Amino acid sequence: MSHPFETLTPDLVLDAVESIGFLSDARVLALNSYENRVYQVGIDESEPLIAKFYRPQRWTNEAILEEHRFTFELAECDVPVVAPIIHDGASLFEHAGFRFALFPRRGGRAPEPGNLDQLYRLGQLLGRLHAVGATRPFEHREALGVKNFGHDSLATLLQGNFIPKSLLPAYESVARDLLKRVEEVYLFHP
């Protein structure tokens, strides 16, 4: 079985960024990302850019663009997010079968555990994020639910060869107990 990103080489990353008019300095640094692939790409005589390559067959263009629009809305409401770069009127690009977006490079740091001022600020930001998100529903993004993100994921793990057989009974028991608790929470907060 081939991996969806097996052809996403450093050269292809550079070619993709250059395909829309940015001249790279040939530096590519892979960054942490679970679902997609994200790289810092050096740009000649300018700040590096962040290139996010979306997992093939995972997201529709409409879902990606809806995410971009939401990020722009958050930025307009002074929620500190990093919105994608709009280049020639677009924020989503395609090269060699891969869809990607470019972002300015922004640093950050994790909050200090136990710092109540930082936790309060995080709570405020989450509230603002939810307030902006509540202004209109997402139409193209999969809803976060117990079935699709819980039971379906558990079924995939149990049916595949992902968990050592010796751990399967305990894993399944704990997972089902947790999903039951999550279902109870969703009854009161769908």
Describe each PLM feature range.
Residues 1-24:
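Juxta-kinase regulatory segment immediately upstream of eukaryotic protein kinase catalytic domains
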Residues 18-25, 174-184:
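Short Pro/Gly-enriched beta-strand edge/turn motifs at strand-loop
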Residues 35-51, 84, 179-190:
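Active-site acidic catalytic loop and adjacent metal/ATP-binding pocket
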